[in-house]
From Swiss-Prot:
It is found in: Cell inner membrane. The RCK N-terminal domain binds NAD and possibly other effectors. This is expected to cause a conformation change that regulates potassium transport. NAD(+) 2 binds at residues 234-262. Residues 143-227, 368-453 form the RCK C-terminal domain. It comes from Escherichia coli (strain K12). Pfam families: TrkA_C (PF02080), TrkA_N (PF02254). This is Trk system potassium uptake protein TrkA. Residues 1-123, 232-348 form the RCK N-terminal domain. The gene is trkA. It is a peripheral membrane protein. Keywords: Cell inner membrane, Cell membrane, Ion transport, Membrane, NAD, Potassium, Potassium transport, Repeat, Transport. The lineage of its organism: Bacteria, Pseudomonadati, Pseudomonadota, Gammaproteobacteria, Enterobacterales. GO terms for cellular component: cytoplasmic side of plasma membrane; cytosol. NAD(+) 1 binds at G7, A8, G9, Q10, V11, D30, T73, S74, R98. Its main location: membrane. GO terms for molecular function: NAD binding; potassium ion transmembrane transporter activity.
Length: 458
């Protein structure tokens, strides 16, 4: 597939890294020549220096015969105009744009379609982050929760702790503890190394366990791996930007929410707009302010400013002063590895959320959901099975007969409204949504090939 990526920042560069090794012809466009040279030194791709919305630049990038344009520059307006130019001048069939501003996202249905601004798929990073954080608030103790099949199935990542009934026992004993609940442990990471789970695998404290279950059973499975935490009640947010304000708006009906904003004018605006959130003007690294607002009674402290260092430092201070759990938004990928699991309980990467959303639209075969996991090393995907026994490598076959790539596990199959946790004898049918987990994303091309019907596959 011939793909043009506009923007060589963290998202554009990471997307190129994900796609360049999958038999794609990638061209990256950016105004920053140094960024482009860095990418070209690392990967086998073309680069074009220039403004991504200019017709001349797009023509030079190969828009005449491109299959897809992905606009992820730092400017919403550039991304929108680029999609319009690609549609009007080059008839590029697939156009994806990252749009940050809530003003545009709010009216997306009216703004973005072929008769207006021709964007096929809109990626709204701030909304993705809000959704991710909200899911983690719904499941205290989870490190990550990803929904598939319109929310019917979830993949959850939890750390195993002493106190969980399964610790020190084989995975096969889970059925004895939960006879009426089906789940599939897709992977276990122990000391950062993947273990392919078997029934005889002993779960150890400290293991990072990835499991798939019907969404309504997630809490029950979590209770096998750790003592369930009490639901959060008191939440303190730091940062009143798009993410902080959007999160407060979503939480304030069900939780006691306080928000700290260091810009006085912005704090005043939020105090007027938010109905049940208490807004403070101040600095979250101010110990006196935190003490006055009873940080020791806060169940969850969430720092979502656009400053990584400020988020990390304020969260560390809050934890030291008694906040039960702290979560931070981190832009730099290197920081995520450094802080998660130390004093910081959970680090959220907006880039990772954006990449996951983008990959679900650029994967081959009928891939309808993608989640990039463990800082991009692993991947969970939702693929739709098409064809019949003569044209498909999966349709009409039981799971045990399917030649899955190394490190790939089928976790669940959704058929209509029915969720079926995978077992060796489950037969895949036309139209099934198949949820898979890959401990190594380098095999994603092999998985895509499995789900591409072909009369010549034999």
């Amino acid at each position: 597939m011939k793909i043009i990526i506009l923007g060589a920042g963290q998202v554009g560069g990471t997307l190129a890294e994900n796609l360049v090794g999958e038999n794609n012809d990638i061209t990256v466009v950016d105004t920053n020549g140094e960024r482009l040279r860095t990418l070209q030194d690392k990967f086998d791709l073309r680069v074009v220096q220039g403004h991504g919305s200019h017709p001349r630049v797009l023509r030079e990038a190969g828009a005449d015969d491109a299959d897809m344009l992905v606009a992820v520059t730092s400017s919403d307006e550039t991304n929108m105009v680029a999609c319009q130019v690609a549609y009007s001048l080059f008839n590029t069939p697939n156009r994806i744009a990252r749009i940050r501003s809530p003003d545009y996202v709010r009216d997306a249905d009216k703004l973005f379609h072929s008769d207006a601004v021709p964007i096929d798929h809109l990626i709204a990073p701030e909304q993705l982050v809000i959704d991710n954080i909200y899911r983690l608030i719904e499941y205290p103790g989870a490190l990550q929760v990803v929904n598939f099949a319109e929310g019917k199935v979830s993949l959850a990542v939890v750390k195993a702790y002493y106190g969980g009934p399964l610790i020190g026992n084989a995975l096969s004993t889970m059925r004895e503890h939960m006879p009426h609940i089906d789940t599939r442990v897709a992977a276990i990471f122990r000391h950062d190394r993947p273990i392919r789970p078997q029934g005889s695998t002993i779960v150890e404290a400290g293991d990072e366990v990835f499991f798939i279950a019907a969404s309504q059973h997630i809490r029950a499975v979590m209770s096998e791996l750790q003592r369930l935490e009490k639901p959060y009640k008191r939440i303190m947010l730091v940062g009143g930007g798009n993410i902080g304000a959007g999160l407060a708006r979503r939480l304030e009906k069900d939780y006691s929410v306080k928000l700290i904003e260091r810009n006085q004018q912005r704090a005043a605006e939020l105090a007027e707009k938010l109905q049940n959130t208490i807004v403070f003007f101040g600095d979250a690294s101010d110990q006196e302010l935190l003490a006055e607002e009873h940080i020791d009674q806060v169940d969850l402290f969430i720092a979502v400013t656009n400053d990584d260092e400020a988020n990390i430092m304020s969260a560390m201070l809050a934890k030291r002063m008694g906040a039960k759990k702290v979560m931070v938004l981190i832009q730099r990928r290197a920081y995520v590895d450094l802080v998660q699991g130390s004093v910081i309980d959970i680090a959220i990467s907006p880039q990772q959320a954006t990449i996951s959303a983008l990959l679900s639209h650029v994967r081959k075969a009928d891939i309808v959901g993608v989640s990039s996991l463990r800082r991009g090393v692993a991947e969970a995907i939702e693929a739709v099975a098409h064809g019949d026994e003569s044209t498909s490598r999966v349709v009409g076959r039981v799971i045990d007969e399917i030649k899955l790539p190394p490190g790939t596990i089928i976790g669940a199959v959704v058929r209509g409204n029915d969720v079926m946790i995978a077992n060796d004898n489950l037969r895949i049918e036309q139209g099934d949504h198949v949820i898979m987990f890959l401990t190594d994303k380098k095999f994603i091309t092999d998985v895509e090939r499995l789900f591409q019907p072909s009369p010549f596959f034999l």
